Amino acid sequence: MRFAARVEYDGTGFAGFQVQPGRRTVQGELEAALRSIGGGERIRIDGAGRTDAGVHASGQVIAFTWSGRVIAAKVLGRAIRAVLPPDVTIGPLHRVGIGFQPRRAAVRREYRYTIWNGPRSPLRERYALGVRERLDVSAMDSAAVALVGRHDFSAFGGKHIQPIRTLYGVRVRRKGRVVTVDVAGDAFLRQMVRSIVAALLRIGHGEATMADLEAALRSPDRVFAGQVAPPHGLCLRRVVLGGDPPVSIGKARG
């Protein structure tokens, strides 16, 4: 039997999603939970996205194949949640086809980067980047239009054999002292979203313009600013799955 579920986690204490020897990861904790209730059998977790160290998620999608005794999805989900640590949980389990792979099934991924644009606030800045100087959000949002569409994003991510990606939308909004950068695309290069945020922050500070973004897209061998925004402000909020019919998986609550 193969199951899929939404996963939510606080990335603060993790070295990323993907298993890494000797380091605490989201995949590692999920596989440990399955191993503990599956009699010690190694059960591999597959994820829709490989978030970096410190990055959070409220809409990650995972899947695994359960070969243990026949058990209702609701009961198995409850057992998994009971042994997971406090900083990660899964939503209701859904039966999927044996060949279902979240990474291949994902047709859209949505991230949000949160900025606290005000006086120092230890509580707010646990999940948001603190920026003291007032940002020009209008300039940031206007410039972000240049990034929408299908481009070579080499300048905004690590080296990749296929750097062509499609962004469906990039929006920058302000609500009081909270500024959010929402980025939606088909897939992302490593640190691509945080590099985009760093570039938009330069524009918000008046240090760069929309023309600079356009130049970076035309010259993919040049890393834009060579900087990435810190991970703690970033959250993978939603993964849209394709298929015929599209796969539908509920939120990470249970």
Residue ranges: model-predicted function:
Residues 1-254:
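Structured-RNA-binding interfaces characteristic of tRNA pseudouridine synthases
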